[in-house]
UniProtKB/Swiss-Prot annotation:
The keyword Repressor applies. Transmembrane segments: none annotated. Belongs to the HrcA family. This is Heat-inducible transcription repressor HrcA. Negative regulator of class I heat shock genes (grpE-dnaK-dnaJ and groELS operons). Prevents heat-shock induction of these operons. Gene3D superfamilies: Winged helix-like DNA-binding domain superfamily/Winged helix DNA-binding domain. Keywords: Repressor, Stress response, Transcription, Transcription regulation. One of its GO terms (molecular function) is DNA binding. The keyword Transcription applies. GO terms for biological process: negative regulation of DNA-templated transcription.
């Protein structure tokens, strides 16, 4: 059912009309004429005034004309502007059943990743031949050297991610790769609606998104990754655990509606 849209009393503003246009488009996903926007968004201005704003917004690259009828569609620039203003990224309590169904209903690929809480507990020297890094949940071994032992002892108490990052920065690449494999195998990842990734099959980011590795280098928030796709990351509480949520989909997916639907508090 189409949601009635209210955009406030100051409807003569160009930004308000553009917001109303994008909100309406997200619900119907088809070109919008001035008459239809007035009806669906409940605008208290004339169709002629709306058409004038259509022309201005088209010149600014926010809208483009779909066909000779005068109906318009939002551009990438309009979506980018709208989502940057509309989305929030505070911690969200997530309902598991709603997350699964909403991912499919809204056409989004979603991934939940529980951050690894393991820390380097100790470094064990074995007869000057091996060094064993003990993270409690798992361990790894590498060849002994006095320099490496000293280096690792200074990292006791650090998280797996920190140890891996520091190892890579000091060119200890063998250790960094070993920790990456161990961390990945011990990370809890849950995926929903894999079909939501089909548009990214040829993207160089495909496997990093599928495996959740992209979360390591992206801050929470909004990221435009392809001409018609975007990625959203935010912290969530899922089954009483703090996790990271990754959402990927087309620009015209209703991300606001998705987050409202999966919220435990709704």
């Amino acid at each position: 059912m189409l949601r009635r849209i209210k955009v406030g009393s100051n409807l003569n503003k160009k930004e308000s009309l553009l917001d109303a246009f994008v909100k309406t488009y997200l619900q119907i996903l088809e070109p919008i004429s001035s008459k239809r926007l007035k009806e669906l968004a409940d605008l208290k201005i004339s169709c002629a005034t709306i058409r004038n704003y259509f022309q201005i917004l088209s010149k600014e690259g926010m809208l483009y004309q779909a066909h000779s009828s005068g109906a318009r569609l939002p551009t990438f620039k309009a979506f980018e502007n709208y989502w940057q203003k509309s989305l929030r990224f505070e911690t969200l309590k997530v309902n598991e059943k709603r997350l699964k169904s909403a991912s499919e209903n809204f056409g989004l690929f979603t991934l939940l990743k529980k951050p690894s809480l393991e820390r380097l507990e100790r470094v064990i020297e074995c007869e000057k031949r091996f060094l064993i890094l003990d993270f409690l949940a798992f361990s790894c071994a590498l060849g002994y050297s006095v320099k490496m032992e000293k280096f690792l002892l200074e990292l006791v108490g650090r998280s797996v991610k920190e140890v891996r990052s520091i190892a890579a920065s000091f060119n200890a690449l063998s250790l960094a790769r070993q920790l990456e494999r161990l961390e990945y195998s011990n990370t809890q990842i849950t995926r929903f609606n894999l079909m939501g990734l089909k548009t990214l099959l040829n993207s160089p980011l495909f496997f990093d998104i599928l495996g959740g590795k992209v979360l390591e280098r992206l801050s929470k928030g909004l990221h435009f990754i392809e001409p018609d796709c975007m990625l959203v990351t935010r912290p969530v509480e899922f089954q009483n655990k703090r996790m990271q949520l990754l959402c990927v989909g087309k620009l015209e997916c209703d991300y606001e509606g998705f987050f409202q639907t999966i919220s435990e508090e709704e």
